[in-house]
Amino acid sequence: MSISAIITAYERIEQTLATLRVIQNCMPPPDETLVHVDANQLACENAIRNDFPSVRILRSEDHVGPGGGRNKLVAAAQFELVASFDDDSYPIDSDYFARALRIFEKFPEASLVCAALYHAGESIGLDERSAHWAADFSGGACIFRRQAFLDAGRYVPLPVAYGMEEVDLAIRLHSQGGKILTTRWLRVFHNTDLKRHGDPRVTAGSIANLALLAYLRYPVSLWGIGVGQCANRLLWLLRHGRRRGILRGVTMIPPHVWENRRYRAPVSKKVVRSYLALRRAPVVVEL
């Protein structure tokens, strides 16, 4: 079994190059590495070509966001298993890809395997051989089954995707009987302290995206759950002092929903409740 590695890049050239170095130094390395360069960032593309001539590069002239970039990368990947990273996330363990292959061999029913993700300033946990079936995943620290990703309909491409892209795809995978396995035996380091999450644009997007998620995937009878999720997000932002961007987020809900209405494909009430139940109570398995 072979594995592709994909990275979404934008403006952060040095971080992208650092991530590529770690990935290429893994033992064994992935069988191919692809990078998507967003928004016509030619300087980033040229730097990658100069330092890593064997890496396949895809570039979008428009700003398609990380989800839009991953859509293109997964579609272009040669192999069925696709390990996904951000421009500032990379494996902690040098045998990451070998471990990933062993996990997929043991759990052929897994549509996606998600690693334990650690951020700058956090204590890094041991690589315990533990795992559980989960509802959600992190797009910068996971391995997709390529066909399952494509069959689920890929990501909704959003420039600011916080609170939307991964949950949306997870719900659609769940509706198709797909399963997400999370394990601490795979570890990924996200080289950020998450300060950018305080950006007003991120705050606004996280509010509008929750409303969009409810509109796109929930049946009308469950839209009340979406309202509650938006309210909880607002309360969390207020408690954490992230007031800048809240008003913008609320007012952008109607146009945001309208612009993305073509993606509406609600799942059943049973699927939504099953997904939320799994989120509350993951199922432990033996690795």
Positions of the model-derived regions?
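Non-catalytic, C-terminal membrane-associated alpha-helical segments of glycosyltransferases
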Residues: G205, L222-L287
